[in-house]
From Swiss-Prot:
Functional summary from the UniProt entry: Tumor suppressor serine/threonine-protein kinase involved in synaptic plasticity, centriole duplication and G1/S phase transition. Polo-like kinases act by binding and phosphorylating proteins that are already phosphorylated on a specific motif recognized by the POLO box domains. Phosphorylates CPAP, NPM1, RAPGEF2, RASGRF1, SNCA, SIPA1L1 and SYNGAP1.
Protein name, as recorded: Serine/threonine-protein kinase PLK2
UniProt feature coiled coil, ranges: none
Domain (Protein kinase) ranges: 82-334
Entries under PANTHER family matching the protein: SERINE/THREONINE-PROTEIN KINASE PLK, SERINE_THREONINE-PROTEIN KINASE PLK2
The encoding gene: PLK2
Entry comment on modification after translation: Catalytic activity is enhanced by phosphorylation of Thr-239.
Family note: Belongs to the protein kinase superfamily. Ser/Thr protein kinase family. CDC5/Polo subfamily.
Low complexity composition bias: residue spans: 43-55
């Protein structure tokens, strides 16, 4: 067997700093504790890379005894001086140290390899190959390679510094992680790994100790000591390499290492994060390998069904049966659960609390009391993690319909998760609530509109205390309150309002490459990009609005975009041209622009097998049903929620939601409202 890796990480023991070697501090302000320096604008995000050495033998370790590495290190080529700090980790060939550039105080993780450790040609080749592969990589979720140099004693590789060490350290402190945390970390691992595979590079040693966490709790894939170029099947190396517990059956059977082998290791990583131990851990290596070859492991009942299914698919014995990285992100495990936009550093040692309070939430509790007071015994709910009765399956099978979601959710500093539980939906019930109660519900609906949406004069003002989650929450509460309390009726009410509002007339899903594009009824074209940013081309085709976060808008001419936005503006124009040339409008609503209302931009979208859901910054909510081209649009105007229904003949009718609450509506419309609510709850969750 060749090269079975084991890396041992040292606790970051306190070491005496550079002052001893220099007689003074490393930087201008030596008395202060020096935090990691923020990166320059042009550089990738700064983070840690206590990257272990190129390779370590499994059966024996060489001693690291040898000449003490100097505290001050000089690059012979450039003359730059560095100060060596504490040990971050060690392995068979090298140790990894914190190292500071004395010219600018920038901190690196430096892998220092004594020439004596790589004296044999094949050992030196491994180091050279690692440098060659790693130095060309540039990705947010891959440890950044900065520089390497040699002196008479050592080889020095300078890498991105990650102050919060590795996932192995976090799991050691935490024992197990919550599902939202696992989704948070896995999304980033998949992002980095997808980039590597697109560069035709296999990592071949994915494990918790090789996922590094920076100051901002961002994950970076590191340690390319065993990485290799992807070869055609017939030319693949038959080397057995990697961490014993994470080796795949095909690697153990010497059939070669492909992308599927990295997916297998990812399955082991997910299992370990959730349960605190690897899936194939046994008392001896021989038994471990037998279990791996047979893909035999236990799946505790404590795991929820989506997590079990995703792990089982990644740990399929046959490599061809494993999901692709895109399949993984579209799996129910990600679609049906909350994923935080960021994690607090306290998550390194403490279980996070995702039940955060916010001004919007406190308001909802008061405003929605009338919607939910004393109703729970009268309404039935469906728990989508449990069995659903047969008569409801056709309407409420959304959980199984969901094949594809939008992109990762748009960053939001205030995003909260109200309830970590499966989404629920309402089933129609008989009985008519008292008139006073309906009036109370109508008042509550108006109160929520007035309190959150009706008084806004700009999108930034609308969302100052609000978030993507609370926009969805508001619409869901209002729609659910209406559905729970309106009477049964055979037809749509007579009311027909003449109103003006924006809605989506055309859309294009190009999320496999760029993002989701749409055209509004005023001919504004918008794209929600795969990175969560949003860009709009106004009807004049000359002005671009760019939203990096909720409520934060940059405006610039389409013909003179800032350099960093040029490629996105090109994509935006492509979407605009495509929809103009190839798609027809989806209904008969007049195109009216109200300059007093904030500009619409898309917050979220979701596709199931039956429908497309879109949620906008001002609370406008649209669901398009594929099979009959019917549409539901909910928006707020003048402290009132309005619902527009576009039927199969593309004829639209608009009602006040309070009218539907009092009069009821046809089963045709009610079923669509319930399905729309189910999609919204699914996305909220």
């Amino acid at each position: 067997m060749e090269l079975l890796r084991t890396i041992t990480y040292q606790p970051a023991a306190s070491t005496k700093m550079c002052e001893q070697a220099l007689g003074k501090g490393c930087g201008a302000d030596s008395k202060k504790k020096r935090p990691p320096q923020p990166p320059e604008e042009s550089q990738p995000p700064q983070s840690q890379a206590q990257v272990p050495p190129a390779a370590a033998h499994h059966h024996h370790h060489h001693s690291h005894s040898g000449p003490e590495i100097s505290r001050i290190i000089v690059d012979p080529t450039t003359g730059k001086r560095y100060c060596r700090g504490k040990v971050l980790g060690k392995g068979g060939f090298a140790k990894c140290y914190e190292m500071t550039d004395l010219t600018n105080n920038k901190v690196y993780a430096a892998k220092i390899i004594p020439h004596s450790r790589v004296a044999k040609p094949h050992q030196r080749e491994k180091i050279d190959k690692e440098i060659e592969l790693h130095r060309i990589l540039h990705h947010k979720h891959v440890v950044q390679f900065y520089h390497y140099f040699e002196d008479k004693e050592n080889i020095y590789i300078l890498l991105e510094y990650c102050s919060r060490r590795s996932m192995a350290h976090i799991l050691k402190a935490r024992k197990v992680l919550t599902e939202p945390e696992v989704r948070y970390y896995l999304r980033q691992i998949v992002s980095g790994l997808k980039y590597l595979h697109e560069q035709e590079i296999l990592h071949r040693d994915l494990k918790l100790g090789n996922f590094f966490i920076n100051e901002a709790m961002e994950l970076k894939v590191g340690d390319f000591g065993l990485a290799a170029r992807l070869e055609p099947l017939e030319h693949r190396r038959r080397t057995i390499c990697g961490t014993p517990n994470y080796l795949s059956p095909e690697v153990l059977n010497k059939q070669g290492h492909g992308c599927e082998s990295d997916i297998w290791a990812l399955g082991c990583v997910m299992y370990t994060m959730l349960l605190g131990r690897p899936p194939f851990e046994t008392t001896n290596l021989k038994e471990t390998y037998r279990c791996i070859r047979e893909a035999r492991y236990t799946m505790p009942s404590s795991l929820l069904a989506p997590a079990k299914h995703l792990i089982a698919s990644m740990l399929s014995k046959n490599p061809e049966d494993r999901p692709s990285l895109d399949d993984i992100i579209r799996h129910d495990f990600f679609l049906q659960g909350f994923t935080p936009d960021r994690l607090s550093s306290s998550c390194c040692h403490t279980v996070p609390d995702f039940h955060l309070s916010s001004p919007a939430k406190n308001f909802f509790k008061k405003a929605a009391a009338a919607l939910f007071g004393g109703k729970k015994d009268k309404a039935r709910y469906i728990d989508t993690h449990n069995r659903v009765s047969k008569e409801d399956e056709d309407i409420y099978k959304l959980r199984h319909d969901l094949k594809k979601t939008s992109i990762t959710q748009q960053p939001s500093k205030h995003r909260t998760d109200e309830e970590l539980q499966p989404p629920t939906t309402t089933v129609a019930r008989s009985g008519t609530p008292a008139v006073e109660n309906k009036q109370q519900i109508g008042d509550a609906i108006r109160m929520i509109v007035r309190g959150t949406l009706g008084s806004c004069s700009s999108s930034s003002e609308c969302l100052e205390d609000s978030t993507m989650g609370s926009v969805a929450d508001t619409v869901a509460r209002v729609l659910r309150g209406c559905l729970e309390n309106m009477p049964e009726a055979d037809c749509i009410p007579k009311e027909q309002l003449s109103t003006s509002f924006q809605w989506v007339t055309k859309w294009v899903d190009y999320s496999n490459k760029y993002g989701f594009g749409y055209q509004l009824s005023d001919h504004t074209v918008g794209v929600l990009f795969n990175n969560g940013a949003h860009m709009s081309l106004l009807p004049d085709k000359k002005t671009v609005h760019y939203y990096a976060e909720l409520g934060q808008c940059s405006v610039f001419p389409a013909t003179d975009a800032p350099e960093q936005f040029i490629s996105q503006v090109t994509v935006l124009k492509y979407f605009s041209h495509y929809m103009e040339e190839n798609l027809m409008d989806g209904g008969d609503l007049p195109s009216v622009t109200d300059i007093r209302r904030p500009r619409l931009y898309l917050l979220q979208w979701l596709k199931s097998d039956k429908a497309l859901m879109m949620l906008f910054n001002d609370g406008t909510f649209q669901v398009n049903f594929y099979h009959d081209h019917t549409k539901i649009i909910i928006c707020s105007q003048n402290e009132e929620y309005l619902l527009t229904y576009i039927n199969e003949d593309r004829i639209s009718t608009t009602f006040r939601l309070t009218t539907l609450l009092m009069s009821g509506c046809s089963l045709e419309l009610k079923n669509r409202m319930e399905y729309a609510l189910n999609m919204l709850l699914q996305r909220c969750n």
